Every structure is written in structure tokens, then in C-alpha cells.
């Protein structure tokens, strides 16, 4: 599966604690305090992001994609670090901010500005728990948030919620943009399920291949694939829902 967020942020916590101890020993107690605080925040995030706990609500992200003031203050060492790291990584990668997988279906990274959004005023599915919805998007785009830790997967039930929501938007001829931090894991898992639900792929494995053709650097891990397997099994055990049913439901649900 590779190194997950718990390991990476855990190492960051240890590094910051060593820096705290070093500064304190060299007689810089005031400079050492921010390092200690950042170390403790990183440790808390590493524990909460562990797959056995998986508590993305820790960061307090609202359903509209914004963060409350208390979260921005309390978790500032983590929240602003991941935003800065994301911006730097995407600048150096040269990868496009989004890719069109099929007509009206886009997957990509966190849209930090309007030019990072696909055309056509798309409905947005945000798969992050750490990235904010930018203020310029508020009210202009239909929005759904399924908060998920980086390198982790949305739960099968959350995937189904996102798929049904996206199907309604497509029935209304509205483009759909699914994003995570980089458009490589969390968002790809949801897009795989959506392609299957819309009849554009036979199963999630074929959907993954289709997405990889359009966005070569995607890399789902074992957690993403496990969630998709569970989602697929639940879908097979549930009554079949055709495209016509989705269109009819969209007429009653325009949210």
C-alpha cells in the first residue's frame, strides 16, 4: 500500500519534537514552544488518520467545505502545512489540475483557484478533509463533501452517497468534478464507482484503467480497492437501479 499519512505525519511529529528539545536545550524556550505544539498536533492527526481509527471529523470541516475558526487555529500547523505542500508539489509535477475522463466527468486535484476548475460550472465532489472550499466557489457550484484523510479511502456508504448525487447532476446535464488533493487516490476511487454506475465501465477495475489512460499518475492503494470491492458487493446485493430511475429521482431532488 505504500507509506500512509499516519507514518508520514508521525515522522513529522518526531522531527518537530526533536527540534523542540534541541532549541530548549540550547536556551531558546520561546522558539521551542511552537515546535512542541506542532509536534503534538501532528501526533494527534497521525493517530486519528490510522485506518483502525479513521476519524476525519477531527479537523471539523463543515459540510459546505469550510473550516470553523477553532479548527483553523487549533490545527493550523497541519492545515496550512498541507496546503503549502500541495501547492508546491503540484507546481513541480507539471500535471494538469484536472482530467476529463468522459464527457462531463472530471477528476483532479484541489481547486485552489477558479482556473483550476473544469469548464461548465461543474458540480463539485470534495473528497478531502484537510483542504478548504475556496470562497469564490461558494454559491456558484453545487457541492458535496465526503471528508477523507489523504491516502485513505471514502467508506463504501460515502462512495454510494457521492455516486447517487453525481448521477442526479449528470441527469440534469451538469458536469461533475471529483477532487482530492492531487487527483490520484480518493477522488479516483469515487470516479471509478461513478463510471460503473453510469454504465461507462463494466466494473471498477476497468474504470481504473479508463481513468489511468486519461490521468496516468493516479495510484489507488489497497484501502481504495477494498472500499470499491465492498461497494461493488453492496451494489450487486441491492435492487438494480437503472439510468431512467436516476433521471426520475433527479426530478424530485434538485439539490
Name each model feature, range by range.
Residues 1-103, 233-237, 241-255:
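Non-catalytic regulatory/accessory regions that flank a structured catalytic core
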Residues 3-4, 68, 109-112, 155, ...:
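Alpha-helix initiation/capping motif
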Residues 74-178, 182, 193-239:
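Cysteine-based protein phosphatase catalytic domain of the PTP/DSP
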Residues 184-190:
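Glycine-rich nucleophile elbow surrounding the catalytic serine of serine-hydrolase chemistry
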Amino acid at each position: 500500500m505504500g507509506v500512509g499519512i499516519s507514518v508520514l505525519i508521525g515522522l513529522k511529529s518526531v522531527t518537530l519534537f526533536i527540534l523542540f528539545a534541541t532549541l530548549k536545550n540550547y536556551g531558546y524556550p520561546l522558539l521551542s514552544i511552537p515546535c512542541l505544539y506542532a509536534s503534538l498536533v501532528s501526533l494527534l492527526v497521525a493517530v486519528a488518520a490510522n485506518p483502525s481509527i479513521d476519524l476525519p471529523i477531527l479537523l471539523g470541516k463543515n459540510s459546505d467545505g469550510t473550516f470553523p475558526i477553532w479548527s483553523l487555529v487549533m490545527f493550523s500547523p497541519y492545515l496550512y502545512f498541507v496546503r503549502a505542500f500541495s501547492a508546491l508539489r503540484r507546481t513541480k509535477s507539471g500535471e494538469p489540475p484536472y482530467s476529463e475522463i468522459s464527457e462531463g466527468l472530471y477528476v483532479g486535484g484541489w481547486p485552489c483557484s477558479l482556473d483550476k476548475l473544469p469548464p461548465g460550472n461543474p458540480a463539485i465532489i470534495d473528497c478531502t478533509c484537510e483542504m478548504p472550499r475556496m470562497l469564490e466557489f461558494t454559491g456558484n457550484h453545487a457541492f458535496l463533501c465526503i471528508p477523507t484523510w489523504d491516502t485513505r479511502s471514502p467508506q463504501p456508504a460515502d462512495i454510494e452517497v457521492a455516486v447517487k448525487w453525481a448521477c442526479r447532476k449528470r441527469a440534469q446535464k451538469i458536469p461533475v468534478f471529483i477532487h482530492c488533493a492531487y487527483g490520484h487516490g480518493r477522488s479516483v476511487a469515487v470516479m471509478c464507482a461513478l463510471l460503473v454506475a453510469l454504465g461507462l465501465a463494466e466494473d471498477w477495475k476497468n474504470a481504473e484503467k479508463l481513468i489511468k489512460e486519461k490521468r496516468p499518475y493516479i495510484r489507488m492503494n489497497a484501502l481504495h480497492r477494498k472500499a470499491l470491492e465492498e461497494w461493488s458487493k453492496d451494489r450487486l446485493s441491492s435492487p438494480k437501479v437503472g439510468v431512467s430511475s436516476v433521471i426520475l429521482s433527479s426530478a424530485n431532488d434538485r439539490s
